[in-house]
Amino acid sequence: MDIRLDEGFLFGMGAFETIAVEKGKPILLEKHIERLEKAADFLQLGSCSARGFSKEKVFSYLASQDSEMTDHGVLKIVCSAENLFFQMRTNTYSEEDYAKGFVADISKVRRNETSSLVYHKTLNYGDCILEKRAAMAAGINEKVFVNTKGQISEGTVSNIFFVRKNMIYTPQLSCGLLPGILREYVMSKFSVVETIIYPDELMYYEECFVTNSLMGVMPVRQLGNICFPHRTRAEEVRTIYESEKMSL
C-alpha cells in the first residue's frame, strides 16, 4: 500500500468510514459513501468519486479478500487529499457481548459541541481512541462524553439512546455528536425524541442502548452508577435491525 504523507497523516485532515461486512455484503454502503463524501467536502479534500472511488471498487476489493474476513468483517475506507484506500479486519463483537450488555462510564473528557469536526467522521479521532483505551483498561466497554454544557453527547465509538415508558430518546445533534449511520436507521424505523439529557437525569430512564455500524444495537446494563435492568425496547430495535440488515 502506497500512502502519501499529506495533511491527513500530518494533521488529521482526512475522513474515514467503518462498514460492517456480513457474508460479503457491506451493510448500508450507500449511506456510508454519502457521509464520506460530505466529510471530504467539509475538509476540502476533493470528491472521492472524482478520484475513481465507487461502489464497484468496494465490491472488487471485498472479492479479493479472504472469505473468512468478509463473512463477519469490517471494511475501513480512508480518504485524505492524496490518499484513498481500503483496509479489512475481523469484527470482534460477539453474541456474548449482546447477552451481557455493555458497562459504560461518563468520560471526564468534554466533547466540544462548538467544533465542526465533531459532526464528521474525521482522522481527528484521538479523544475517542484514548478514552476507548481507558475504558478497556478499567474493565468496561465504553466511555460516554458530555459536552461543555454538561449534556450527554455520544460514546467514544457509539451513539446513545435511552428508553422511558417505552419511548426512545437520544441526544440532539447540537449536543455535539456524529450523526451515526445506525442512529439514522433507528430514527427512521422508530419514533425517537431528540432532546437534551444530563447525567443526573439517567435515573429516570428504564433502558439504555448504544449503536454503531459494527455492533449494530447493543444493550447497556450500566452507565456510571446507574443500572438498566430492562432491555425490552433495545432487543426489539436490535431484532428488527438484524432481520433487515442484509437488505440495507
Residue locations for each model-derived region?
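Short secondary-structure junctions
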Residues: S64-G73
